[in-house]
């Protein structure tokens, strides 16, 4: 099972997302179920390392957000056109 550490994201928009990516992080969103959508920030390098392992895209993952664990599956991954970078991930609650 995969565990990803995440932080709640307060700033929204293109400028905030660009600042995150420059700092080695990227935005993601968790939606689905009865709870409201949750915007989070993930560390790029640790997520890229996990994404290279078998089962990352198909298994149920655990997002650790402020000490709370959320079971999620990956819905969509957006990547940079030519750099080996993830720019955004959509998670759906499992």
UniProtKB/Swiss-Prot annotation:
| GO CC terms in record | cytosolic large ribosomal subunit
An annotated GO BP: translation
Q: Which domain of life is it from?
A: Bacteria
Entry-linked Pfam families: Ribosomal_L25p (PF01386)
Provide the alphabetized UniProt keywords: Ribonucleoprotein, Ribosomal protein, RNA-binding, rRNA-binding
UniProt-recorded Gene Ontology molecular function terms: 5S rRNA binding; structural constituent of ribosome
- Give the multimer and partner information: Part of the 50S ribosomal subunit; part of the 5S rRNA/L5/L18/L25 subcomplex. Contacts the 5S rRNA. Binds to the 5S rRNA independently of L5 and L18.
Report the family membership.
Answer: Belongs to the bacterial ribosomal protein bL25 family.
Q: What does this protein do?
A: This is one of the proteins that binds to the 5S RNA in the ribosome where it forms part of the central protuberance.
Which protein, by its recorded name, is this?
Answer: Large ribosomal subunit protein bL25
